[in-house]
């Protein structure tokens, strides 16, 4: 949902839009809670409170102040990610298609011939990093840019087996127009750009697990972050390959040589980072034109020194000349060297050309070895060709996508490689490598071992759920790692499936109850965004590839009503109740009936089941931004601090009742996952609370009334206001609690309206208006370690007769309390008090 805050209402009517006027009789938190549970996607918030907007944003719900009709139109028609700390809106708006336009934020693309393969009459527009160059389109009171681009389509095409780009592009645009927006993927770059600076500022040692190409620019500013990926393809791995011949296969209709060179250099940079944790100077031989340097420098400041007889326009220092073996002495330490020297073929015969290429390969290797043989902190990426060669067995082979699969590939060498054993590799084996292996990631660091790192902050986004990681090892890491942000795939199946298919692999699935962690927050993507200064207009879908975000060691843990809170907890319930259910009271009715409470009079006001816990369980797929386990735990230890809102402290037994209702709901829906989740949450409640039951009671609290509007034959008709199991020396403690509660007890507005048979031979009258006070009393006894209440639900009633009688119905009648007393069962009254 998105909340657009206005000072006055608008005449225009928008689809899927609801108006909410700030209620001055309620505080900012209560207004935020009410807004968050509205069911439309767009909320026009009139006469808004700035603090209410802040509360919503910290909860991950995008809430933006609107100052003009243009701002309203821009935000109501698309989804966006909001940096609420810097008041910047990142639109995810593809309406530019109506300009016959596709967009890119990678400059190198604009220097290719891609325009020849677009849809007829279409153009390509460069919009800068995250759409920064579009800021001039929006003259708004907040900073606004459109981060939507088609780079995902371009990159997917490059790695696909398809050659016809126009057909591919058309299909992908049609898919985009007919499927829901993948908001997590679109906002992820914005999220990473907020996340890592904040983590690095606090933690000296940061580990990042499983980065992919979409993160390749993000980490250029963070050389100290230790990366873990899937490892490199080494020369020694070629021993498994059978020899092949030249393939000569076209990969892309438009020239992607620039992209290949950029990937080679970025791969080398990250390889250097993992060795030396600092930024290198970048030397490049055969550099022209290297338009992609512009892209890298948009993200991070690097020094490029280049050699080529042709221009390299974005280089820091360019030498318009050839580079020779003798020039290696010009290259300094703390650097990387990219050797991409290759003479143009021109009209040369292919055999003659082949000789030249092989000579250049030998020359390139000679320069690489000479560069690495002296000095320190050096890494080289060198262009090679398929030929009979000796290479160090630990050299890293690269084959990033290029326009045609021919004879070229690249190798990364460091100062240790040149002193290791070399292996002879025949030309046919290199062709087998070129023909069959595509380097899919610029991060070629070793895989992460699932073990705790006590001194490090671990970030693992979408990286650990794969089933090649033992499931229990994943759980152990999350349970034991003190500081981390780790995601695992949520179990949103209905058959409680332990693993699910994802692309060509399987992922383990998890529920919050799989983990035993303290001082940690378990939430959704949008809940996590709120913790790091962002919010989003579109929540994750209830099904599909969604993840739990588990934040260990956060200082936000005790801020229960600010982050990963209960905002939106009833939204799905409202959607169902007011659209498709038998009555809008269906949830209240079911919760009472499933706990054998058949008095449904006032069920929406007076009920014994925690609606928060019930909704958090049965609709967890919709509202898992709410950290239920944290909420339960902080209540159990009495560490709940709230800034505002309508706060009600549940008695622990109310939470148990909610679990029982949720289990029955799950059984009726054949939802095995909710069934297990509710069982495990009930177990967790029993673990963190010390709940005892007076199922064999020896005392009871009675309430006498001035008069009863029914016939009765018991000596003194009374309301049994709970039973206790206590020793005689605890009587004083019970009386102390009753005295503290005296005012509230006598303020109860008790009423009755019918009689019924509680069981065979027990005729009783219903009693309404007492449950909220009963649970307050329960909590007082619980905190004083006094066993009060039974395991079955408390059903307030007044015993009239121990014989079978017919039901009597009367007008709802108020009962005046005469006295409240404590009496031993089958014994004497030990305490009595009157108003």
From Swiss-Prot:
Region annotation GTase/RTPase activity: where it falls in the sequence: 556-692
Biological processes, Gene Ontology terms: symbiont-mediated suppression of host innate immune response; viral process
A Pfam family that the UniProt record links to this protein: Rotavirus_VP3
Region (2'-5'-phosphodiesterase activity): 693-835
Main location per the UniProt record: virion
EC numbers for this chain: 3.1.4.-, 2.7.7.50, 2.1.1.56
Superkingdom, taxonomy of origin: Viruses
Free-text function comment from the UniProt entry: Multifunctional enzyme involved in mRNA capping. Catalyzes the formation of the 5' cap structure on the viral plus-strand transcripts. Specifically binds to GTP and displays guanylyltransferase and methyltransferase activities. Has affinity for ssRNA but not for dsRNA. Capping activity is non-specific and caps RNAs that initiate with either a G or an A residue. Together with VP1 polymerase, forms a VP1-VP3 complex positioned near the channels situated at each of the five-fold vertices of the core. Counteracts the host innate immune response thanks to its phosphodiesterase that degrades the 5'-triphosphorylated, 2'-5' linked adenylate oligomers produced by the host cell IFN-inducible 2',5'-oligoadenylate synthetase (OAS). The host RNaseL is therefore not activated.
Name the UniProt record assigns to this protein: Protein VP3
């Amino acid at each position: 949902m998105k909340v657009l805050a206005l000072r006055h209402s608008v005449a225009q009517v928008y689809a899927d839009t609801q108006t909410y006027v700030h209620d001055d009789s309620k505080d900012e938190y209560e207004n935020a809670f009410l807004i968050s549970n509205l069911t439309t996607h767009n909320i026009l918030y009139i006469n808004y409170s700035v603090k209410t907007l802040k509360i919503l944003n910290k909860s991950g719900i995008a809430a933006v102040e609107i100052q003009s009709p243009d701002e309203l139109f821009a935000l109501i028609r698309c989804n966006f990610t909001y940096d609420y700390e810097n008041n910047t809106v990142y639109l995810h708006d593809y309406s530019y298609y109506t300009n016959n336009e596709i967009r890119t934020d990678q400059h190198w693309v604009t220097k290719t011939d891609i325009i020849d393969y677009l849809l007829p009459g279409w153009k390509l527009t460069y919009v800068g990093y995250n759409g920064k160059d579009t800021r001039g389109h929006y003259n708004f009171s907040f900073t606004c840019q459109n981060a939507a681009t088609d780079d995902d389509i371009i990159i997917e095409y490059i790695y696909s087996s398809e050659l016809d780009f126009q057909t591919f592009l058309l299909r992908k645009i049609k898919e985009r127009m007919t499927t829901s927006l993948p908001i997590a993927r679109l906002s992820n770059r914005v999220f990473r750009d907020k996340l890592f600076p904040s983590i690095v500022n606090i933690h000296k040692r940061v580990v990042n697990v499983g980065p992919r190409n979409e993160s390749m620019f993000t980490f250029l500013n963070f050389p100290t972050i230790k990366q873990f990926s899937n490892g490199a393809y080494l020369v020694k791995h070629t021993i498994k390959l059978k020899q092949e011949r030249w393939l000569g296969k076209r990969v892309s209709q438009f020239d992607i040589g620039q992209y290949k060179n950029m990937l080679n250099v970025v791969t080398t940079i990250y390889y250097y980072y993992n060795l030396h944790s600092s930024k290198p100077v970048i030397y490049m031989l055969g550099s022209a034109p290297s338009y992609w340097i512009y892209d890298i420098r948009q993200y991070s400041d690097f020094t490029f020194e280049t050699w080529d007889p042709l221009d390299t326009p974005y280089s820091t220092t360019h030498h318009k000349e050839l580079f020779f073996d003798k020039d290696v002495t010009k290259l300094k330490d703390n650097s990387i060297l990219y050797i991409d020297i290759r003479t143009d073929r021109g009209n040369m015969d292919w055999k003659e050309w082949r000789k030249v290429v092989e000579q250049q390969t030998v020359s390139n290797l000679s320069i690489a070895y000479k560069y690495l043989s002296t000095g320190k902190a050096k890494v080289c990426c060198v262009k090679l060709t398929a030929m009979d060669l000796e290479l160090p067995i630990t050299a890293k082979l690269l084959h990033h996508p290029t326009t045609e699969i021919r004879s070229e590939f690249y190798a990364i060498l460091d100062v240790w490689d040149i002193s290791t054993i070399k292996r002879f590799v025949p030309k046919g084996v290199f062709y087998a490598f070129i023909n069959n292996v595509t380097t899919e990631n610029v991060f070629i660091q070793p895989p992460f071992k699932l073990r705790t790192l006590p001194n490090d902050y671990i970030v693992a986004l979408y990286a650990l759920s794969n089933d090649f990681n033992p499931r229990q090892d994943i759980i152990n890491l999350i349970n034991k790692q003190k500081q981390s942000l780790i995601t695992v795939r949520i179990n949103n199946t209905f058959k409680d499936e332990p693993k699910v298919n994802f692309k060509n692999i399987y992922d383990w699935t998890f529920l919050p109850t799989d983990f035993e962690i303290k001082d940690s927050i378990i939430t959704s993507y949008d809940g996590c965004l709120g913790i790091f200064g962002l919010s989003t207009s579109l929540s994750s879908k209830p099904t599909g590839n969604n993840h739990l975000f588990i934040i260990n060691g956060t200082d936000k843990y005790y801020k229960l009503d600010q982050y990963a809170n209960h905002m939106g907890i009833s939204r799905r319930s409202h959607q169902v109740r007011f659209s498709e259910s038998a009555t809008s009271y269906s949830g209240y009715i079911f919760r009472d009936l499933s706990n054998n409470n058949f008095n449904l009079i006032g069920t929406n006001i007076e009920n014994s089941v925690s609606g928060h816990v019930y909704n958090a369980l049965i609709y967890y797929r919709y509202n898992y931004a709410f950290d239920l386990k944290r909420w339960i735990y902080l209540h159990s230890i009495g560490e709940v601090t709230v800034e505002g809102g309508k706060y009600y402290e549940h008695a622990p037994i109310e939470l148990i009742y909610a679990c029982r209702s949720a289990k029955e709901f799950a059984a009726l829906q054949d939802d095995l996952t909710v069934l297990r989740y509710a069982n495990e949450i009930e177990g967790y409640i029993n673990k963190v609370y010390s709940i005892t039951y007076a199922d064999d009671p020896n005392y009871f609290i009675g309430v006498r009334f001035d008069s009863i509007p029914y016939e009765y034959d018991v000596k003194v008709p009374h309301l049994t206001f709970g039973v206790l199991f206590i020793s005689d020396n605890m009587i004083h403690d019970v009386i102390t609690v009753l005295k503290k509660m005296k005012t509230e007890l006598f303020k109860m507005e008790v009423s009755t309206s019918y009689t019924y048979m509680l069981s065979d031979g027990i005729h009783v009258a219903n009693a309404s208006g007492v449950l909220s006070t009963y649970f307050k009393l329960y909590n007082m006894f619980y905190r004083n370690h006094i066993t009060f209440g039974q395991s079955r639900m408390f059903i307030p009633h007044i015993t009239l007769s121990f014989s079978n009688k017919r039901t009597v119905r009367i007008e709802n009648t108020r009962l005046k309390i005469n006295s409240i007393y404590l009496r031993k069962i089958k014994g004497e009254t030990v305490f009595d008090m009157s108003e």
